[in-house]
Amino acid sequence: MSFKPLHDRIAIKPIEHEEKTKGGIIIPDTAKEKPMQGEIVAVGNGVRNKKGEIHPLELKVGDKVLYGKWAGTEIEIKGEKLIVMKESDVFGIIN
């Protein structure tokens, strides 16, 4: 991937949920909820404070995270769908 987020932004590859219910019913795209789990594929350098110092982000590439249903902006890079959002939009890291 050739995308580098700026400042306190991160790029997440959403983890898709099952497209079929346990009973075998196929869920159409229009009825699916936006994924709320993903893997971080790129991070920005960090946030600059009032003194001009850069504080690096806590999240790193490879972290699996939970984020808000409507957080971020969807983009497509080389056919891969990503969501770009601020680090503060992430609820936490999944272990």
From Swiss-Prot:
One of its GO terms (biological process) is chaperone cofactor-dependent protein refolding. The gene is groES. PROSITE patterns: CHAPERONINS_CPN10. Its main location: cytoplasm. Transmembrane segments: none annotated. Together with the chaperonin GroEL, plays an essential role in assisting protein folding. The GroEL-GroES system forms a nano-cage that allows encapsulation of the non-native substrate proteins and provides a physical environment optimized to promote and accelerate protein folding. GroES binds to the apical surface of the GroEL ring, thereby capping the opening of the GroEL channel. InterPro entries: Chaperonin_GroES, Chaperonin_GroES_sf, Chaprnonin_Cpn10_CS, GroES-like_sf. It is found in: Cytoplasm. Heptamer of 7 subunits arranged in a ring. Interacts with the chaperonin GroEL. Belongs to the GroES chaperonin family. SMART domains: Cpn10 (SM00883). Keywords: Chaperone, Cytoplasm. Disulfide bonds: none annotated. It comes from Rickettsia akari (strain Hartford). This is Co-chaperonin GroES. The keyword Chaperone applies. It comes from the Bacteria. GO terms for cellular component: cytoplasm. GO terms for molecular function: ATP binding; metal ion binding; protein folding chaperone; protein-folding chaperone binding; unfolded protein binding.
